[in-house]
Amino acid sequence: MNFLLKISRGIDAFTDFIGNHVTDYIVVLTIIVGFYNVFVRYLGRFIELQLSSNVYIELQWYLFSMIFFLGFAYVLKHNVNVRVDFLYANWSERTRAWVDFVGTLLFIVPFCILGIYVTIAPVWFSWGFLPNGTWGGSIEWSPDANGLPRAPIKSMIIVAFALLLLQAISQVIKYAAIISGHVEIAKQIAAETEVTAVE
């Protein structure tokens, strides 16, 4: 169990790095690009020139999408997803661990695997590969003039499912540890999922 808990800690550290640092920079970039879009649109109206471009508009929604794609695993780790817990809150740590263990194994893990499986072919084709595996010569682009390629943002869907799957595996390890009597893991999860009430 100690070896598995080391793996779980490594996955948790990676998830926290993505959720705390990478997404922070993406949020800042999204704000900058959004501000630029608004500024040049109004400036363009004022001076009667078209200054805005589909590149920046699409870049803004690509970045916005990436915040969510990269944040799913972080949400799972810190248990800040929507939960109807009028029963769950009154259960013992071990009972909660059993419910989370079974729920994660039966729902989240298969959902991630299915998501990756279903997404691989469209992403593969968007990079220009044909069904027989040969490269067709061009990647999928936005249908809008001056748009961005679609392949990179479609690839982020697979990355999101993979990160969520990794974190689900980490959670399963932690729940199994609680079930087998590792009380310190229950305390660790409680500390990670503590959300300060906003007043």
Predicted regions and their residues:
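Alpha-helical transmembrane segments and membrane-interface helix-loop junctions
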Residues: 1-199
